[in-house]
Amino acid sequence: MKLQQNCDLELRLFPTSYDSDSSDTTSVVESTSSGNPQPNEESQRITIFYNGKMCFSSDVTHLQARSIISIASREMKTKSSSNGSDPPNKSTSFHHNQLPNPKASMKKSLQSFLQKRKIRIQATSPYHSRR
């Protein structure tokens, strides 16, 4: 069984060149408490990002982590081969087109905050007085 070549399993690092351009892609990141691999530990914590969801597990053995990474790499290879060549990063172009005007966004946020604050104040006042 051959694992993904650009994934260093000994350091448990996932390559930084991976583009997560769709919500149904899989990526795996394993983290330890100190950041350095600890060979004495039987199991370690792992964080899995799958289909737009984040899952945590604190009892994953080294063999299980390798299996998860292997399955994820096979799924990514299958999806990339079915799409042909790698598509451009859609998420960055989407975010650039969807960024609102910062001033308008701040104004809308402030108005929403003030409205909610007004409602909270009215709800907590003993006589529900209107101002």
From Swiss-Prot:
Changing L13A: Decreased transcriptional repression activity. SMART domains: TIFY. Repressor of jasmonate responses. Unable to associate strongly with COI1 in the presence of jasmonoyl-isoleucine (JA-Ile) and is therefore more resistant to JA-mediated-degradation than other TIFY/JAZ proteins. Repress gene expression through direct recruitment of the corepressor TOPLESS to cognate transcription factors. Interacts with and suppresses RHD6 and RSL1 transcription factor activities to negatively regulate jasmonate-stimulated root hair development. It comes from Arabidopsis thaliana (Mouse-ear cress). It comes from the Eukaryota. Its main location: nucleus. Induction: (Microbial infection) Triggered to degradation by the pathogenic Pseudomonas syringae HopZ1a protein in a COI1-dependent manner, thereby activating host jasmonate signaling. This is Protein TIFY 5A. Belongs to the TIFY/JAZ family. It is found in: Nucleus. Residues 79-100, 122-131 have a biased composition (Polar residues). Residues 39-74 form the Tify domain. A motif (Nuclear localization signal) lies at residues 106-113.
